[in-house]
Amino acid sequence: MAKISCSSFFVLMLVFSVFSLVEKAKGDERCTIIIHPGSPCDPSDCVQYCYAEYNGVGKCIASKPGRSANCMCTYNC
């Protein structure tokens, strides 16, 4: 009887661990927002504003070659 209880315990722990990992993965979603879309991007301002407002990472990225860069902020949703 002890062998059945021990193996059942380990199976339940394995199932519980898998569900815990799945829930954690769902919570790690990342969002992206364009900050001040019409304004030219200053890299230092972009980084500081994104971190202060969203606790994220800001980068100046041009949507197409030849266009001015926009401040793209990536943060946890």
Swiss-Prot record:
It is found in: Secreted. It holds the Pfam family SLR1-BP. Belongs to the DEFL family. Residues 1-27 form the signal peptide. InterPro entries: DEFL (IPR010851). One of its GO terms (cellular component) is extracellular region. Keywords: Antimicrobial, Disulfide bond, Fungicide, Plant defense, Secreted, Signal. The keyword Transport does not apply. This is Putative defensin-like protein 157. It comes from Arabidopsis thaliana (Mouse-ear cress). GO terms for biological process: defense response to fungus; killing of cells of another organism. Disulfide bonds join 31-77, 41-60, 46-71, 50-73.
